[in-house]
Structure formats: structure tokens, C-alpha cells
Amino acid sequence: MKKNNYFYFLIFLFLNLFFLPVKSDPIFELGKTIFLEQGNCAVCHTLTDAKSSGQIGPNLNQLKPNMTRIIYAVTNGIGVMPSYEGQLTIQEIEAVAHYVSLSANQ
């Protein structure tokens, strides 16, 4: 019986480590806060994790952008989206890129 319990524990541990999204990451949490409050991203963009349903910018769940693409768009602006280079630090831009790339690619 103990071997059975050990086996199930290992399966549980494996599933938690490799298949559940990591959301206790402080950079992830900072990025989420910026997305929702400071950057006003949620006003224009749809992202399930943020419970946002903006209709102006692209749906990030469908776009599934990587960090490089997000950093470029936030830093330089793209289309009707303005640049946030003067409003956010590079660390804040990287944090929001980290958050969006992980959330959109779940």
C-alpha cells in the first residue's frame, strides 16, 4: 500500500510541476498588475487570465505573442497602440511581456 501512495504522490508532483501554470512568480504578478492597472492594456485587449475583453486591440489569447513581440509593441507602439516607453520602465515592460506571453500561451 505504501508503494501505491508513493506512486500517486510522484504523479501528483509531476503534474503540478510541469502542467500547471506558474502564477506565484513575482514577475508574473507584477506584469498582471501592470496589465490591469498601470498600462491600461485590459481596456483594449482580450486576455482570459486578466478577465479582460477589450475590442480595440488584438485578442491576445488568439495571437499568442512571445516576449520579444510584446516588448517591441509596448516599447515602440504598433497600429493605434501608443508607445509606453516613457511611462513604463524596461523592467515593467519585461514583466508585462512575461505575464502576457505565459497567460496567452496556456
What spans do the regions from the language model cover?
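Post-cleavage N-terminal segment of exported redox proteins
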Residues: 1-29, 73-74, 87, 98-106
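Sequence/structural segment immediately N-terminal to covalent heme-attachment motifs in c-type
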Residues: 26-47, 62, 76
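Generic hydrophobic-segment detector
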Residues: 21, 44-47, 67
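Residue-level signal for beta-strand positions within conserved beta-sheet cores that form or flank
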Residues: 20, 40, 56
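Terminal low-complexity/IDR "tail" segments
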Residues: 50-51
